[in-house]
């Protein structure tokens, strides 16, 4: 298991970001990746989970986080980022898929933009209780993205889980990674 924690002050707001990853039993590499980018004003956090486990999943999630981090840092629009990732990931010979989930959190002061692709929806703890948040659904190359804009108060948290094996289901009941995703 690996845990990383980073605290940074952005625009008079303190962001505490912690990541816990755990390798699948018997695997030396983890299929989850997290990229953290900080500057004086903002933070960008990208989480990705590659299809499968071990080396294959690690390659997919590493490519996804690296490409998204680089493109977002260069202010590339999200639709172009998603298209580039989809066209670049190597195809799995067994499953005939090139697939990795991702969640992007971009902060600006006490506000944040949250973009989620095929991960369970993040849990937003607002004022000490699990809060509901709205999201718009956007389709980019048949990929369903959930985009939200959140406001954080002192003590608020955003918890992002990843999918777990083939048993995970999306909020609408479909299996993660089902055809068209």
Predicted features, each with a name:
Residues 33-86, 155-157, 163-177:
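Primarily the active-site beta-strand->alpha-helix module of PP2C/PPM metal-dependent phosphatases
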Residues 10-15, 39-42, 107-112, 152-155:
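Beta-strand-turn-beta hairpins that frame and shape the catalytic cleft
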Residues 30, 60-128, 140, 144-147:
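Catalytic core of PPM/PP2C metal-dependent serine/threonine phosphatase domains
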Residues 122-135, 173:
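A short alpha->loop->secondary-structure connector
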Residues 27-38, 132-165:
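Acidic loop->beta-strand submotif enriched in PP2C/PPM serine/threonine phosphatases
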Residues 1-28:
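Regulatory cytosolic signal-relay segments
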Residues 180:
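Hard-cation-handling environments
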């Amino acid at each position: 298991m690996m845990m990383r924690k980073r605290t940074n002050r952005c625009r008079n707001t303190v962001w505490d970001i912690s990541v816990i990853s755990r390798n699948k039993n018997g695997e030396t590499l983890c299929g989850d990746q997290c990229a953290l980018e900080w500057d004086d004003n903002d933070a960008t956090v990208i989480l990705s989970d590659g299809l499968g486990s071990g080396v294959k999943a690690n390659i997919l999630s590493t490519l996804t986080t690296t490409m998204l981090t680089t493109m977002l840092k260069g202010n590339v629009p999200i639709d172009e980022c998603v298209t580039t990732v989809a066209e670049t990931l190597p195809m799995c010979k067994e499953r005939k898929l090139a697939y990795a989930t991702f969640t992007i959190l971009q902060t600006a002061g006490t506000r944040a933009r949250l973009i989620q692709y095929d991960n369970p929806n993040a849990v937003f703890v607002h004022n000490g209780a699990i809060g509901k948040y709205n999201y718009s659904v956007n389709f980019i190359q048949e990929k369903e993205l959930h985009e939200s804009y959140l406001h954080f108060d002192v003590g608020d948290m955003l918890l992002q889980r990843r999918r777990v094996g083939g048993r995970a289901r999306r909020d609408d009941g479909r299996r993660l990674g089902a055809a068209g995703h």
